[in-house]
């Protein structure tokens, strides 16, 4: 059911979800670890590594995968999922700055999200997070297997949304479950708060924004990437995607009923999840700048009275315009990519409502938006080497 997929893919998180996944692995491992820690050895996929290199950890004003691991072990709560670092404090940070030297990071060739953490103390604890930032797939204490759920990329909850078409998703949005709409309201409130915090922060990218839409989106993304200790409602595993697909709808100033605005936000969220099911959760393509913008374009078009054809044209044209905007790691600069996507969503929605769209055959744009999405999937998979090569430059001036 779309309701189940929605609740599985829309969750609050403190901080960028890649270092948070690392912190979650050590926080869970701490429950089983005995005695003083000798070392923490972590193996990651390239995308998780890429997104954790230079993004600030919430509440710390600094960054580092090793630090995230130490914070998770020392003061993380493994029962809080993506909110694992919600309660960190200055004392914990001081201890973690010393402990991070015990953490060793290495890479593997996995193409999906993969965090394999081994904590060596008086005993040895292995924690594997796989497929999703909060999916604890494996727990092994010494040689005793506590949990072992075999991961298959095609069996994740996000894959199930492929059983629906965009028309079916739009139909559901017209008559959604009541608890889903209530949760959308919560998502709007949560993401507005961090955006408003960013707007009132000197030096935030939103300070020079030229309209309200990009001001709110850039403010939220910049605040989150800067390590502000505030929750963000994530969409398909990403807080930036959550901000970029929710805020352009949330701040709409036109005269519309609140329920209509909530439904439009829901459509934006579901379209984002739908496209991410094809591209993958962690990819070489910028989710906040391109995929979420397609969701926002759909939501804005629906909000302004657009029909199914116009909504799908808005999605089609956004993907045709923004595909190729790459992900070179999580950082403050993501705010500028989100700005680019928001501008495009606004423009494309206006064009769609006037029945103006990119002709099929122009670049990757197909006549049927579902075919365009499949082309985006194929092309995303064709640039996998980007993730390896870009690591040569991240963090280096």
Curated annotation (Swiss-Prot):
BP-aspect Gene Ontology terms: L-cysteine catabolic process to pyruvate
Query: Using the chain's own numbering, where are the disulfide bonds?
Result: none
A Pfam family annotated for this chain is SDH_alpha
Tell me the domain of life. Answer: Bacteria
One of the entry's Gene Ontology molecular-function terms is: L-cysteine desulfhydrase activity
Q: Which InterPro entries match?
A: Ser_deHydtase-like_asu (IPR005130), UPF0597 (IPR021144)
Family designation: Belongs to the UPF0597 family.
- The molecule here is called UPF0597 protein Tmel_1007
- Organism expressing this protein natively: Thermosipho melanesiensis (strain DSM 12029 / CIP 104789 / BI429)
What phylogenetic lineage does the species belong to? Bacteria, Thermotogati, Thermotogota, Thermotogae, Thermotogales
């Amino acid at each position: 059911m779309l309701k189940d997929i929605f609740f599985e893919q829309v969750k609050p998180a403190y901080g960028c979800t890649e270092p948070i996944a690392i912190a979650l692995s050590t926080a869970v491992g701490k429950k089983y670890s005995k005695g003083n820690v000798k070392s923490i050895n972590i193996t990651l996929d390239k995308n998780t590594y890429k997104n954790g290199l230079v993004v600030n950890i919430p509440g710390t004003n600094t960054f580092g995968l090793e630090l995230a691991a130490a914070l998770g072990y020392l003061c993380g709560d493994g029962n809080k999922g993506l909110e694992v670092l919600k309660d960190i404090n200055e004392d914990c940070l001081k201890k973690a700055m010393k402990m991070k030297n015990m953490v060793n990071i290495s890479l593997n060739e996995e193409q999906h999200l993969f965090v394999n953490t081994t904590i060596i103390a008086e005993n040895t604890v292995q924690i594997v997070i796989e497929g999703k930032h909060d999916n604890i797939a494996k727990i092994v204490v010494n040689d005793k297997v506590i949990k072992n759920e075999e991961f298959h990329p095609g069996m994740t909850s996000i894959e199930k949304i492929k059983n629906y078409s965009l028309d079916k998703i739009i139909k559901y949005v017209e008559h959604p479950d009541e608890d889903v709409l209530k949760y959308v309201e919560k998502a709007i409130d949560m993401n507005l708060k961090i955006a408003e915090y960013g707007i009132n922060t000197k030096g935030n990218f939103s300070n020079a924004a030229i309209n309200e839409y990009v001001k709110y989106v850039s403010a939220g993304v910049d605040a989150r990437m800067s390590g502000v200790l505030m929750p963000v409602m994530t969409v398909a595993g990403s807080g930036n995607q959550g901000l970029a697909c929710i805020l352009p709808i949330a701040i709409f100033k036109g005269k519309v009923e609140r329920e209509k605005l909530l439904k439009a936000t829901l459509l934006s969220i579901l379209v984002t999840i739908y496209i991410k099911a094809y591209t993958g959760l962690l990819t070489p393509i910028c989710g906040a700048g391109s995929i979420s913008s397609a969701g926002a374009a759909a939501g804005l078009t629906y909000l302004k009275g657009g029909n199914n054809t116009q909504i799908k044209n808005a999605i089609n044209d956004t993907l045709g315009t923004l595909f190729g905007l790459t992900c070179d790691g999580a950082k403050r600069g993501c705010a500028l990519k989100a700005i680019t996507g928001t501008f495009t969503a606004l423009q494309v929605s206006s064009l769609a409502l006037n029945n103006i769209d990119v002709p099929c055959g122009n670049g990757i744009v197909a006549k049927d938006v579902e075919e365009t999405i499949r082309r985006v999937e194929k092309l995303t998979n064709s640039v996998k080497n980007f993730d390896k090569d870009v690591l040569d430059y991240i963090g280096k001036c």
